[in-house]
C-alpha cells in the first residue's frame, strides 16, 4: 500500500467510508459494485460485507486516533487528521509493506510528533515501512535502516547513527565544512 505526498481522499465521503473503500479490495472484487455504490451514495450494498468492513474500518480509525470522527466528512478534517485518514485507508488492505511519500510534508511540529507515534505503532504491528521524507528528526526517530540518495544516486546506507555521521551525507546535505 502507499500514500502520496499530496493527500488524496474522497472528499464527498465520510471518514469511515474513505477507509471502507480501502478495505473493499480485501472483501470482494466487484469493482462495479464499488463504483455504482459510490454513485448511489450506498458504498457497500451487501449488509454482512458492509458490517465487516465497517468494523475493520472503525478499528483502523481508532488505531489512528480518528475513531470519534468516523461520521464526519473527510473534507472537514484538519490537515494532520487527513494524513492519518489516508494512512488508515492504506492499512485497510492489510499490507505487509507501506510506502509513505513525505507524510510529514506541510505538518506542524505537533502533528509530526503525533505522526511519528502512529508510524512506530504501524511498524510494531509488523508492517514494513518505506519512508520518503525530508524531516530528518522523523526519519532518524523511526528508521532502523536508512538509504540516502543524492540526485538519484545512493550515497549511503545503514543504521541512523552511521548515516547521520557519514561525511558524504553531511557534505551532500549540509555542504562542506569551511575552515577559516
Regions inferred by a protein language model and the residue ranges of each:
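Glycine-rich phosphate-binding loops of nucleotide-dependent enzymes
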Residues: 1-180
Amino acid at each position: 500500500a502507499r500514500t502520496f505526498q499530496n493527500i488524496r481522499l474522497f472528499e464527498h465521503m465520510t471518514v469511515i467510508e474513505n477507509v471502507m473503500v480501502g478495505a473493499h479490495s480485501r472483501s470482494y472484487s466487484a469493482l462495479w459494485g464499488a463504483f455504482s455504490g459510490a454513485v448511489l451514495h450506498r458504498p457497500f450494498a451487501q449488509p454482512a460485507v458492509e458490517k465487516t468492513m465497517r468494523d475493520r474500518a472503525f478499528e483502523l480509525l481508532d488505531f489512528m486516533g480518528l475513531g470519534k470522527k468516523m461520521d464526519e466528512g473527510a473534507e472537514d478534517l484538519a490537515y494532520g487528521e487527513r494524513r492519518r485518514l489516508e494512512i488508515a485507508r492504506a492499512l485497510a488492505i492489510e499490507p505487509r509493506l507501506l510506502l509513505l511519500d513525505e507524510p510529514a510534508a506541510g505538518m506542524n511540529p505537533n502533528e509530526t510528533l503525533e505522526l511519528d507515534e502512529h508510524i512506530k505503532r504501524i511498524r510494531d504491528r509488523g508492517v514494513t515501512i518505506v519512508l520518503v521524507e525530508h524531516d530528518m528528526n522523523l526519519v532518524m526517530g523511526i528508521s532502523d535502516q536508512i538509504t540516502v540518495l543524492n540526485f538519484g544516486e545512493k550515497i549511503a546506507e545503514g543504521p541512523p547513527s552511521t548515516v547521520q555521521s557519514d561525511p558524504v551525507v553531511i557534505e551532500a546535505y549540509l555542504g562542506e565544512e569551511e575552515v577559516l
